[in-house]
Each structure stands twice: as structure tokens, then as C-alpha cells.
């Protein structure tokens, strides 16, 4: 298995089959710079083919690229079906050995048609181990156990179960005939109105998973290592094998290859046994001695190479599954060996064994970045080292908590212990030496690592040359929080007091500064909005800082300038920090703030700071414009446009961020007034600052919005304001007062703008959260911390259109309950010994979710043993408290604690005392709550049907808890050039230039693959958009291929039931239908509906879209009754969430009417179409095309109804003998069904004349130039720390309706 985004070239080639084989770059002006038209330089990368001669098989051709390394051809051969059993070989060209690490273009004489000979090389111990590991990987290549166990970056995918393999030409294509009989019956549990929520269908058993047994046992022999005399005969190691025929054999791995020896389990005899067959490959030897192996191994490899490459490639970060079927534990020599060595990734392949993580992390940052190829190389190296470091840190953190690592201070109390393992430093999230005594003790110590990680993430994103941060990973495991950090060279040899040359080690009592640090941090202060400021130290001397006092600067022995302890990078959140004598604005007081939180490290999010500054910039422009209007009351100057010259005095923000309210009430709300204000703002922007009146205007506006400069808009925050123990000089009192006011305004802005804005967006379906994670994501995108969840829910409750926010309220309550339960679970687990873990977790789940009134915890059997022995065990792992207090918890007590926690932490009153009351009051589902708590805590449960509602027995037993995984937080390094390409492509698509957009997004895909390898969330978003574009441009096959990759990738990197995966399934179903693969389309839609039911339930706006899709496809295959069930459900849901007069509801009525027409039930059809017609007439007017279409259809229905009635009357008059031609009911054509599917999925093909098109493009280009002028100004002046992901950009969690994702003139949202 390949680790952490590594990908053999063969898989890359398959994975990138849709992409052109080239690598494109940008001009030096900077990525995505569209002002002069994006100049794309093509790096010539024409491939050529070489002939491969390998022993024992026919020669074959291989397409290669000059930029590939020789090593990548090795990897291709190790993956091919006919050469996969070889690992120890070299490639020869004209008798010369090719170097592993040289690029093909540098190999002399290598050209089109060259012959490369595969030559078997002698083994070493290392090569023999690699060979055995590779054979084991081949034998396990279809076995999903590594994915269920969450190891080696394996993860699950179930798409192939629903598509019968590949959807491309190679796979089993569905018949294209429209009227082919196909099985359309959905399972009972996914029908609208079904109360059943089974868990087993979540992970259907793939036919390939019942593995073909090639061998019973392959393991290292107990006779290892070979004695000295045998080493001198070339013996490297011994293997023990039991074949499928039950033959036990002992095998010698020697320098020349593998052969049978005469040893038995108890008798060592290394001499060769008969048949005397020496094979260079272990597989060839096993083929000789076991007919079953020979037959099954061949079948296994055939199946392996038939699987889609995206099902096999390792993901960059480990994804864990919260459920797993019961699996047999098979013997596995490689797994056993890995468990007892500190192998991380492929450690033993690297000289020097353990890696110097700090050196690797910092060296990759120092790589050059002047042009695109350099930046790609740098970003790929950063990403690779980072994913490796995260894997190593996670493994180390688990080893620390499990007690398998010796502490560096073993004599101290468990909580105070620190650890070093594999060159990584580990500390536990407890308040050691009362460091956080004034900030909330252990609670503050638990929160500090995540704040610090956010700081590291931010400084890494700003990426200032010469400033270094530590590799940081935060791991929550078994109730403990472990921080893993790379080690600054020399830090362990010195006291902290000596090391720190900038900042404070005691929260501001002693403070030092350093000119070099001030210079470096000054460069970050602009994008991070941090104010350079003075504080007083313990000797009352003024010290200048450009960060919070806790931020420490240490110069390592390597001469690098490191910053650490970045927990206060962002300003404090005053809503949760009561300060005696300070009053908050009225908006805060009205909402019940300030509220004392359990710690004093509450900070505003970076997104909030950015949104606040943007809001202030708008206010600044409006104030300045209003003053100009007053000055120019007599005569108005002609405004010059923003394009002509960038603003010299106004910086940083785009002209008109959507959705931001104006802060000033004075200006008129009429459109003409706003237009005037905008013109005047542009006048100021174009002014060069010489006009004294403009200077005066700008000075006044700067003062009003709190800018630190009087000549330019520049808002920054002092992160030390309101920090306990930090004092400011007398001379700065005015500045401090202004800064305090700014912080109060920011706190008020969060409550008065951001939270109402979020609720409004949810109401208008601009965002569609589906589960707790997507709700948290949309809150964070707006800078709203999760501690405000109670306030969000209160606002939803008070909203006039409360029922239209039912889905948000339900998700929010579920999130509030599971987060409160997680807080309790964390402390609960800390008191559990390792031997009691499954009993304790199953007891907690019973108390949390089971209706059984008094579950009894099963104490582990060894609790009954005398405890004298325990007195000797002073230094236990952190979890070994010998505490059975957990066993006495009751459901009543747990739910009382959950309600208390909800009140204390979120300030929300839950109206439930048991799980059943919670389900009844808030419409929650127990299976959804189980999923949410499992994902948040790392629990893995057995895949089976749980009887949550049984009052006679508890839902969970010890055997149902299979595992507990770590929950890992880490930095996500970005592929910046690829991201800019992606944004430029989106912009082109939105302007209607689909082909150009498609090319740019293809480029982005190439670059994403270059940096991240084949698997990544952002690559997934790229593939989704590419598929949509190909679909719009009529290339269904390409759309299908890209969307299949997007689904597989979403399953693998985000989770098989993640809301994004559900959306990807829906898109794929549409493209399958368009390609006449009807039964596959239905299978995919049924899967999406099942996942939606499991993750949320029935009553969600997204369910209306899903049911419309299902209903339409069923209508197309003439399953009218089934179709009506789904379409009528969609109509009910749409009516609830969009209101009875919405256009979506009119469309829903029309779809239902069409099915009734097909059933010849004209009265019902007329009734629904009339409803639709009324809505169109009211909303759009009688002359609108839609209204006219509906009117025509009504006439048509009326005529059919009259004709039917006439026929019926004829029958009544003349009896059955009447000679009446049979009524003709035609099935809907596939084209008409597809047309409706496109409409509901937000894809409209608008017929435009050439003139219309030209006018539209001219208008779009004009607007785009204005936007670009503003954007380029931002980019030139302010290298932003992080870009907010645009709709549908990488990072988008699928929380928006498809319509909002890819709008364009030809793709109407």
C-alpha cells in the first residue's frame, strides 16, 4: 500500500486519464492575474513510448513522460498484473544501469522506441523485507480490513457496489434502450414516510471482499535471523508458509532468491528441500508448490487491476470509519512486525532511520518559489512532509496515551509528564505548574493547543520568508488531548528563560523584544490585522511587540527564527470575557453578554476579523462619500471610474462584499442614493491625495471607523487588550481606549450582523447544512465560534418564518446535545482503565441513547482480583487510574449533566430529561445521534441493527464497541497556484466562457494532482465542476468519468456518508440517466436518499431535490405510483421550506401533474397544474413564458379530460360493445424527463441570438474588469493569510444547493 498521497505512476496515469499529459504554468505576474488576459505558458511535456523486456513474459510498450523518474517506471512494473511480483530489479538501456532517481529526459540515448531490459538483482535483507511486504500487499489488495481498521491511509468506498464496476466503456454498460425492463423497486426503508433507519446498508458487502484464499499463513519463521555460518551461505531470512492445501513449508530468502528448506517448526535444517527450485520471486516459488495459490493469485490480480485506481490509492490523511462489520482476525506477519517496530510510513527505506521532522518541515519551506515549477515543487514537498508528520504524530500520541512511551520526566505526576518519540515532542493538555492558573486551569490548558494550532495555520498561510513555526498536530484520544510538536534544535539543552529572546514566558510580567523579530512580524501584521504596540515589563520599561505577549521567539541552534505559543494570535472575544468596569455595546447587553466562560482564552476567529474589517471598509467609503456629497451640494464632480488608477489612500478591500449591512443609518436606502454614494466613493479612490478637501474627508472617515492611520483605511487589533497581567504605557492610553472600543464593536458586529446573516442565508437556502459538521463549517466561514450555537438556535426560534428553519434547528439541537455529551465523555473516559474501555464506552452509549431504563455496566473480570499488585505500579499510562466510578453512571444522571452542560457552555435550555424526550421534542433520530457522537469521539461500533427503543435490554453490549480512534487536528497546506487557476476558471464559467473555464479548471486539476497526489478534497471539487462543465457542453461520457472520480474521492477522503458524498451521488445519477444508464441512476439516487435519511432524516430542503430526481426517473421508466410517492413528498417539503407561493413549488406541482396525466387521472393533474399556474401568474405575471406554458398545458389537459369523459359516456350509453378506439397513453420521452431533471438540478440551456450573446459578454467583461481592478489592488497590497473558499471552491462542504455552486449565463442557478 502506498502511503500519504504517494501514488505509483501507473495509478497516476489511470487517475489522470481525462487530463491532457502536460503541466501548465502562469506568467510571472502572479497566479490568476486576469487583467491582461491570463497568459498560460505550456511546459513542453510530450510523452514517448519505450519497450520493456521482462523475464518470462512478452515484451510490451509503455508510454512515459520525460519528466518522470526511472523510479516511477519501477512503480508501474510493480503494479502491472504480469510484473507485479517483482520488486528487486534494475532497468538497463544498452547494457547501462539506469539510476533510480534520475529523470528520463536526462538519460542519454533514451528516446521513442528504446528497449529497457528488466534485470533481476541480488537481494539484501532490506530488499527481501520489501519483497515480502509487497507480496503481502498483493494478497491483501482486495481485503478492506485495513480500511475498517484505519491504517496505512486506506479508506472505504462503496460506489462500485451500486454501479457494477466501472461506468466507463470497460465496465458493464447498461442498455441504452429506453423501454428495457429494469428493476426499479426501492428498498422499503427508503420510501417516503418510512420510520425504519437501518444501519447495515451503510456498508454493503462488496462481492470482491470475500477474499480468495491463496495461502493460509505467510509469516516470519522463528528461526530468524540466520546464524553466522548460514549468512555466509547467503541466507537473509526464513519464512514459514501453510498453503491452502494444508502443506507446511519453510522457505529461505537468500541473496539469489527464494527456495524451500528442510526446517520444521522444531528442527532447524537450512538445506534445500525438494523440489529444488530457486525462484527470484516468492510468488513464482509459491506457484510451484501450491496449485490453489497459482489459480487464486492469478484471479486476485486480475480483479485488483480491474478496480478503479481511486479505490486503491492511499489518502494523504487517515480517514476513520465509525462502523465496521465483524471481521475475523487473520495472521499477518507484516502487521505483526509493524506493531513491534517504530515503522512510520516507509521509515526503513530512508537512510538514518528516524526522521528529523523539524529539519524536513523547515527545509521544505526554504525551497525557492520564484516561478511556477519551483512553487509546485515546494508546495508538493511541504504537503508530503506534512502528511507524513501528521501520521507519525498520530501514531506517537496513541502510543503515549496507551502507555507505550517512556516519559522524559518519569518521576513526576502522570499529568505533568512529557514525552519524546521519533523526534517529536508530546505534551498532555493539563495545566502543568499552574501555568494557566489565571486563565481557567486545566480547561484553558485543554483549549490552548487548538488556539495555538490556529495560530500556526495562519502564520504558515502568510508564509513570510525567515519566520518559522513548529510542526504541530493536536490529537484527542481516549479522553486526553495530546499536542505533538517538532523539536527546535537545541531547545532541550537550555532553560526556557535563556532561550526566549522575544515575548514573555509568564503572560506579560517579564517581556523582551528583538529587532529581527519585530521586522519579521511586521510583515505578517498587515494580513493578520495585528497592531504593533508597546507594553510595560516588570521594571516598568516600554517594550515594543508585534504580536501578543505570549508569542515567544526562540532562535534555534540552526540559526532559524522560530515563533511558538501562538494561542492569542487573534483578539479576545469580549462577549465571553467579563471585565470589571467595562460595558459592552447595547446589542451585546440585549443578548445577555458578557457571559463568564470556563476559560479566558476565547478569541475571535480570523474569518470574523476579516468580515469586520470589510464591513468597516464599506462604512468608511460611505461616510467619505456622504461628506463629499455635502461638500459638493452645489456642483457634483464627474466621477472617474475605479479602473483608472488604483486607490492610493484606500486599501485592501473589495468594493462590495455581498450580504454586509451598512453600519450608518443616515444614507438614503434608495437605489439612486446608493449609486451616487458609490460614484463619490470612486472619486475618492481615484484621487491622488493632493486635494485638501479629500484629505479632510478621509481623515474624518478614518477617525469614525477606527482606522489607526488618518491618511488611509487601516484597521488593526491589539491582541493584548484585556489580557490579565499586561500593562500599557501612559503615553498609549488614547490608543488603548480606541482599541478597546474596536474590540467591543467587533463583539457587537458578530451578534448584530454575522449571526442574523447566517440565519438569513439558511432561510434563503444560500447554505444548506445537513449534519453537525456542515453546520459548524458554515458558522466558521462567517467567523461564528461554536460557543455561539445557543445564540444561533435562539435566533432561529424567534424567527418569524420559524418552520422554514426546522432543518437548521434540528441539526443545531443535535449538535448541541452531542457536543455536550462529548465534553462529559472526555472526563468520563479519563477515569477508565484500558481493560475496561469497551465496557465503559458501551455503558456510556447505553446511558446516552438506549431507552432501557437502568443499564448495568459490566466491570472487567480482573477488577475482582486482589489489588495489592497495583501499589507497585507508580508510573502508569495516563489512563490507568484504577477507577470504576464510571460504572455507576445512570441515563438520568447523564441527561441531567447534558442539559446542565448545554446551559453552562451554550447558554441554551434543553427541554428534555431523557433521550426519548429529546427525540420526541426535537424530532431527532437516535441513529443520527450515534453517528455524530462516534465521529466526534472516535468510537467505532459494530455494523448491526441496534434496538435503541427496547425497554427490556440495553442497546449496546461490550462486543459492539470495536475500537476507539484518535480525532486529529492539523494544518492543511494549500496548493496556491492550483487554487488561483480554479478561481480563474470559475470566474470564466460565470461569465459564460465555458470552454476557457474548462481549460483553466483542467489546469487546476493537473496542478492539484502535482501538489497533493491523486487524492484530495480540493481535487474532488475540481472534478465535480469539470464533470458539470462537460455535461453542459454535451460530453456525457467525460462528465460521467469525472463525476465517478469525484464520488470515489469524496467517499475516500471525506467519508462514505458525508453530505458532500451524498451530493456527488446525485450529480452522478443525473449523468448516468443522460447516458441511458437508468437502473444505475436509480441505484445511485436510492443510495443518496438512504444516506440522507441516516445522516439527517426525511424533513430537509435537500430531500425535495432528491425526491424530485427519483420521481422523475421513475416516471421515465413508467413506475407511476412509485414516482408519485416521491414527487408528492418533494412537493410537501418544498411547500414547507420555500412557502406555498414559491416558483419551486409551482415546478413541483407541474411534475406531479405530468405523472397524473400519464396515469390518465386528469382531474388530479388539472388540480396540480392549476396550482402551478396560479403561482406563475402571481409571481411572474400573465405574459411570462412560464405562465403561458402552464396555460397551454392546462388547455391540453382539459382537452384530454373532455375526450376521456366523452369516451366514458359513450361506454355508459352503449355498453361494452361500443366501438371505441383505445385511448393512447404515451410514456414520457427520455428527452423530456432529462429536460426536467436539468431544470430541477439548476441547469438551463438558454437559446440566445448571436447579438444577445455579444451584448451579454460585453456587459460581463465590463463588470469583470471592475472586479479584477479591485481584486488586483488587494493582491498587490495585502497578501491575504487565507482566502475564503468561494461557492463550490475546494473546501466547500457541499452545504450549498447545486444551483448556487456553478452559476453561469448558460447554467442558471
UniProtKB/Swiss-Prot annotation:
Keywords: Cytoplasm, Phosphoprotein, Repeat, RNA-binding, TPR repeat. The modification Phosphoserine is found at residues 279, 281, 654, 664, 723. Residues 335-577 form the Clu domain. Gene3D superfamilies: Hypothetical protein (hspc210) (3.30.2280.10), Tetratricopeptide repeat domain (1.25.40.10). Residues 9-25, 1264-1278 have a biased composition (Basic and acidic residues). It is found in: Cytoplasm; Cytoplasmic granule. HAMAP family: CLU. This is Clustered mitochondria protein homolog. It comes from Homo sapiens (Human).
Amino acid at each position: 500500500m502506498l502511503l500519504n498521497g504517494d501514488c505509483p505512476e501507473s495509478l497516476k496515469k489511470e487517475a489522470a486519464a481525462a487530463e491532457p499529459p502536460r503541466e501548465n504554468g502562469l506568467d510571472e505576474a502572479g497566479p490568476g492575474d486576469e487583467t491582461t488576459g491570463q497568459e498560460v505558458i505550456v511546459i513542453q511535456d510530450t510523452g514517448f513510448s519505450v519497450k520493456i523486456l521482462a523475464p518470462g513474459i512478452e515484451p510490451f510498450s509503455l508510454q512515459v513522460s520525460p519528466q518522470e523518474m526511472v523510479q516511477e517506471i519501477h512503480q508501474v512494473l510493480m503494479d502491472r498484473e504480469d510484473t507485479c511480483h517483482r520488486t528487486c530489479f534494475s532497468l538497463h538501456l544498452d547494457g547501462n544501469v539506469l539510476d533510480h532517481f534520475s529523470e528520463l529526459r536526462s538519460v542519454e540515448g533514451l528516446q521513442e522506441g528504446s528497449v529497457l531490459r528488466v534485470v533481476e538483482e541480488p537481494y539484501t535483507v532490506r530488499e527481501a523485507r520489501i519483497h515480502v511486504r509487497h507480496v503481502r500487499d498483493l494478497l491483501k489488495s482486495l481485503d478492506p480490513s485495513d480500511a475498517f481498521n484505519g491504517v496505512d491511509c486506506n479508506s472505504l468506498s462503496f460506489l462500485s457496489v451500486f454501479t457494477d464496476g466501472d461506468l466507463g466503456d470497460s465496465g458493464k454498460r447498461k442498455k441504452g434502450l429506453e423501454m428495457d425492463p429494469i428493476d426499479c423497486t426501492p428498498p422499503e426503508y427508503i420510501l417516503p414516510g418510512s420510520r425504519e433507519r437501518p444501519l447495515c446498508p451503510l456498508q454493503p458487502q462488496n462481492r470482491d471482499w470475500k477474499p480468495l484464499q491463496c495461502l493460509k499463513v505467510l509469516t516470519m519463521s522463528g528461526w530468524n535471523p540466520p546464524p553466522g555460518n548460514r549468512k555466509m551461505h547467503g541466507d537473509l531470512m526464513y519464512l514459514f508458509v501453510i498453503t491452502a492445501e494444508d502443506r507446511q513449508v519453510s522457505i529461505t530468502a537468500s541473496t539469489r532468491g527464494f527456495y524451500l528448506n528442510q526446517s520444521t517448526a522444531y528442527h532447524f535444517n537450512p538445506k534445500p528441500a525438494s523440489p529444488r527450485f530457486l525462484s527470484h520471486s516468492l510468488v513464482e516459488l509459491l506457484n510451484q508448490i501450491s496449485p490453489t495459490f497459482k489459480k487464486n493469485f492469478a484471479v486476485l490480480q486480475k480483479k485488483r487491476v480491474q478496480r478503479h485506481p481511486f479505490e486503491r490509492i492511499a489518502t494523504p490523511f487517515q480517514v476513520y470509519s465509525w462502523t465496521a462489520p465483524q471481521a475475523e482476525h487473520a495472521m499477518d506477519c507484516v502487521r505483526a512486525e509493524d506493531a513491534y517496530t517504530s515503522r512510520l510510513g516507509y521509515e526503513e527505506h530512508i537512510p538514518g532511520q528516524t526522521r528529523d521532522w523539524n529539519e524536513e518541515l523547515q527545509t521544505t519551506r526554504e525551497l525557492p518559489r520564484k516561478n511556477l515549477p519551483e512553487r509546485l515543487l515546494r508546495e508538493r514537498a511541504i504537503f508530503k512532509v506534512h502528511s507524513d508528520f501528521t501520521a507519525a504524530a498520530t501514531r506517537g500520541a496513541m502510543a503515549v496515551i496507551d502507555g507505550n512511551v517512556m516519559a522524559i520526566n518519569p518521576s513526576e505526576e502522570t499529568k505533568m509528564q512529557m514525552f519524546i518519540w521519533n523526534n517529536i515532542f508530546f505534551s498532555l493538555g493539563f495545566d502543568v505548574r499552574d501555568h494557566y492558573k489565571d486563565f481557567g486551569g486545566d480547561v484553558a490548558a485543554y483549549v490552548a493547543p487548538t488556539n495555538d494550532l490556529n495560530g500556526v495555520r495562519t502564520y504558515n498561510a502568510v508564509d513570510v520568508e525567515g519566520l518559522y513555526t513548529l510542526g504541530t498536530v493536536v490529537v484527542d484520544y481516549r479522553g486526553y488531548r495530546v499536542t505533538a510538536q517538532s523539536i527546535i534544535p537545541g531547545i532541550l539543552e537550555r532553560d526556557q528563560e535563556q532561550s526566549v529572546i522575544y515575548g514573555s514566558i509568564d503572560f506579560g510580567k517579564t517581556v523582551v523584544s528583538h529587532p529581527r523579530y519585530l521586522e519579521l512580524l511586521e510583515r505578517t501584521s498587515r494580513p493578520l490585522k495585528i497592531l504593533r504596540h508597546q507594553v510595560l515589563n516588570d521594571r516598568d520599561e516600554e517594550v515594543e511587540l508585534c504580536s501578543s505577549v505570549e508569542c515567544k521567539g526562540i532562535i534555534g541552534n540552526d540559526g532559524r527564527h522560530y515563533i511558538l505559543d501562538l494561542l492569542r494570535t487573534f483578539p479576545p472575544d469580549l462577549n465571553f470575557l467579563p471585565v470589571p468596569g467595562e460595558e459592552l455595546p447595547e446589542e451585546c447587553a440585549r443578548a445577555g453578554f458578557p457571559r463568564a466562560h470556563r476559560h479566558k482564552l476565547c478569541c475571535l476567529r480570523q474569518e470574523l476579523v476579516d468580515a469586520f474589517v470589510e464591513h468597516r471598509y464599506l462604512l468608511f467609503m460611505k461616510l467619505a462619500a456622504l461628506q463629499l456629497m455635502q461638500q459638493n451640494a452645489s456642483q457634483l464632480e464627474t466621477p472617474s471610474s475605479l479602473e483608472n488608477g488604483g486607490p492610493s489612500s484606500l486599501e485592501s478591500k473589495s468594493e462590495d462584499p455581498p450580504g454586509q449591512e451598512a453600519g450608518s443609518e443616515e444614507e438614503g436606502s434608495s437605489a439612486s442614493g446608493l449609486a451616487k454614494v458609490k460614484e463619490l466613493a470612486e472619486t475618492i479612490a481615484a484621487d491622488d491625495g493632493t486635494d485638501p478637501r479629500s484629505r479632510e474627508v478621509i481623515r474624518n472617515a478614518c477617525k469614525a471607523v477606527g482606522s489607526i492611520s488618518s491618511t488611509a483605511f487601516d484597521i488593526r487589533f491589539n491582541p493584548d487588550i484585556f489580557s490579565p497581567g499586561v500593562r500599557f504605557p501612559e503615553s498609549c492610553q488614547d490608543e488603548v481606549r480606541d482599541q478597546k472600543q474596536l474590540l467591543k464593536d467587533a463583539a457587537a458586529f458578530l451578534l448584530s450582523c454575522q449571526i442574523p446573516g447566517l440565519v438569513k442565508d439558511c432561510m434563503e437556502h444560500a447554505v444548506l447544512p445537513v449534519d453537525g459538521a456542515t453546520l459548524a463549517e458554515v458558522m466558521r466561514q462567517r467567523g461564528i465560534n461554536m460557543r455561539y450555537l445557543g445564540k444561533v438556535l435562539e435566533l432561529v426560534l424567534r424567527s418569524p418564518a420559524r418552520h422554514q428553519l426546522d432543518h437548521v434547528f434540528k441539526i443545531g439541537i443535535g449538535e448541541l446535545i452531542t457536543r455536550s455529551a462529548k465534553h462529559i465523555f472526555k472526563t468520563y473516559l479519563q477515569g477508565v482503565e484500558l481493560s475496561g474501555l469497551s465496557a465503559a464506552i458501551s455503558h456510556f452509549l447505553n446511558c446516552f441513547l438506549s431507552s432501557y431504563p437502568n443499564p448495568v455496566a459490566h466491570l472487567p473480570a480482573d477488577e475482582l482480583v486482589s489489588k495489592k499488585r497495583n501499589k507497585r505500579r507508580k508510573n502508569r499510562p495516563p489512563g490507568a487510574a484504577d477507577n470504576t466510578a464510571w460504572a455507576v453512571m445512570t441515563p438520568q444522571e447523564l441527561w441531567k449533566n447534558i442539559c446542565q452542560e448545554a446551559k453552562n457552555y451554550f447558554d441554551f435550555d434543553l427541554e428534555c430529561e431523557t433521550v426519548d424526550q429529546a427525540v420526541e421534542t426535537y424530532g431527532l433520530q437516535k441513529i443520527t445521534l450515534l453517528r455524530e457522537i462516534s465521529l466526534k469521539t472516535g468510537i467505532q461500533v459494530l455494523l448491526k441493527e441496534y434496538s435503541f427503543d427496547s425497554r427490556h435490554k440495553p442497546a449496546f453490549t461490550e462486543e459492539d464497541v470495536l475500537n476507539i480512534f484518535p480525532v486529529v487536528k492539523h494544518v492543511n497546506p494549500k496548493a496556491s497556484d492550483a487554487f488561483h487557476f480554479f478561481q480563474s476558471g470559475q470566474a470564466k464559467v460565470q461569465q459564460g466562457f465555458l470552454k476557457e473555464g474548462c481549460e483553466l479548471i483542467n489546469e487546476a486539476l493537473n496542478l492539484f494532482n502535482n501538489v497533493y497526489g491523486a487524492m484530495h478534497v480540493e481535487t474532488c471539487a475540481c472534478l465535480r465542476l469539470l464533470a458539470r462543465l462537460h455535461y453542459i457542453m454535451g460530453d456525457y461520457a467525460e462528465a460521467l468519468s469525472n463525476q465517478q472520480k469525484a464520488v470515489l474521492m469524496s467517499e475516500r477522503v471525506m467519508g462514505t456518508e458525508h453530505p458532500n458524498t451524498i451530493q456527488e451521488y446525485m450529480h452522478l445519477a443525473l449523468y448516468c440517466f443522460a447516458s441511458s444508464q437508468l437502473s444505475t441512476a436509480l441505484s445511485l439516487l436510492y443510495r443518496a436518499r438512504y444516506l440522507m435519511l441516516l445522516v439527517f432524516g426525511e424533513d430537509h430542503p435537500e430531500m425535495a431535490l432528491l425526491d424530485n430526481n427519483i420521481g422523475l426517473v421513475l416516471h421515465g421508466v413508467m413506475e407511476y405510483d412509485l414516482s408519485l410517492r416521491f414527487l408528492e413528498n418533494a412537493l410537501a417539503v418544498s411547500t414547507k421550506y420555500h412557502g406555498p407561493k414559491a416558483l419551486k413549488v409551482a415546478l413541483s406541482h407541474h411534475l406531479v401533474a405530468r405523472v397524473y396525466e400519464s396515469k390518465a387521472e386528469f382531474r388530479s393533474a388539472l388540480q396540480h397544474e392549476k396550482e402551478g399556474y396560479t403561482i406563475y401568474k402571481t409571481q411572474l405575471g400573465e405574459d411570462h413564458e412560464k405562465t403561458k406554458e402552464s396555460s397551454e398545458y392546462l388547455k391540453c389537459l382539459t382537452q384530454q379530460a373532455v375526450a376521456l369523459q366523452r369516451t366514458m359516456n359513450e361506454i355508459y350509453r352503449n355498453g361494452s360493445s361500443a366501438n371505441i378506439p383505445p385511448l393512447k397513453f404515451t410514456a414520457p420521452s427520455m428527452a423530456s424527463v432529462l429536460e426536467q431533471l436539468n431544470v430541477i438540478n439548476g441547469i438551463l440551456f438558454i437559446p440566445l441570438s448571436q447579438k444577445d450573446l455579444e451584448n451579454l459578454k460585453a456587459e460581463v467583461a465590463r463588470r469583470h474588469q471592475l472586479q479584477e481592478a479591485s481584486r488586483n489592488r488587494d493582491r498587490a497590497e495585502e497578501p491575504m493569510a487565507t482566502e475564503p473558499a468561494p461557492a463550490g471552491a475546494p473546501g466547500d462542504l457541499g452545504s450549498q444547493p447545486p444551483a448556487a455552486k456553478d452559476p453561469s449565463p448558460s447554467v442558471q442557478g
